[in-house]
Amino acid sequence: EALYDICFRTLKLVTPTFGDLNHLISATMSGVTCCLRFPGQLNSDLRKLAVNLIPFPRLHFFMVGFAPLTSRGSQQYRALTVPELTQQMWDAKNMMCAADPRHGRYLTASAMFRGKMSTKEVDEQLINVQNKNSSYFVEWIPNNVKSSVCDIPPVGLKMACTFIGNSSSIQEMFRRDATSLTAMFRRKAFLHWYTWEGMDEMEFTEEESNMNDLVSEYQQYQDASAEPXXEQEEDYEEA
């Protein structure tokens, strides 16, 4: 759904094909793994990504984005600046996930830049974004945006950026899925295909509860505040 929206609204493609969708996916995946394949000023790896992006084991569902968005075979004639890349990267229209990050808060995030650029400028831009949009970041995880810079840009581009965010707004997708699951399960639609293969109806009930618990957990950490911990410390000092 999000990929088709990007093709229609951003790339202005009238009839996007699976090739167009795969182009967006491959560009994003290439950006995620570029630090494993190319040298860079500030490299990263998948282990570091996992450690920095997953604050709790169950909350491991990410939103990804890419900037600049280009269609297949297109050539970029004007190089974007780091501020422009950063602005596009955080834009909800660039997210390849059918959830609006403005409806939640970022627990953690990672920005992977590619091309010749200053790491100082990258860090400054990310700090500016956090300061200007502090309400969209949880306050109880400080310095929760990680950055990396790879010197080799993608083919056809001079600069690019891949974004991975662990946002509580992804619960929108789980809510939609849970609503569809509940509606179909009550009618027992398509259930026989699974019971014939040895599954039990209770497994679907458990998964429905599991999904609702996941939504509640995301909401809980979205609403969590760092203030109670400070109050507890004051009480402890007084005692």
Swiss-Prot record:
The keyword Transcription does not apply. InterPro entries: Beta_tubulin (IPR002453), Tub_FtsZ_C (IPR008280), Tubulin (IPR000217), Tubulin/FtsZ-like_C (IPR037103), Tubulin/FtsZ_2-layer-sand-dom (IPR018316), Tubulin/FtsZ_GTPase_sf (IPR036525), Tubulin_C (IPR023123). SMART domains: Tubulin_C. Keywords: Cytoplasm, Cytoskeleton, GTP-binding, Microtubule, Nucleotide-binding. Its cofactor is Mg(2+). One of its GO terms (cellular component) is cytoplasm. SUPFAM superfamilies: Tubulin C-terminal domain-like, Tubulin nucleotide-binding domain-like. GO terms for molecular function: GTP binding; GTPase activity; structural constituent of cytoskeleton. Tubulin is the major constituent of microtubules, a cylinder consisting of laterally associated linear protofilaments composed of alpha- and beta-tubulin heterodimers. Microtubules grow by the addition of GTP-tubulin dimers to the microtubule end, where a stabilizing cap forms. Below the cap, tubulin dimers are in GDP-bound state, owing to GTPase activity of alpha-tubulin. This is Tubulin beta-3 chain. It comes from Anemia phyllitidis. The gene is TUBB3.
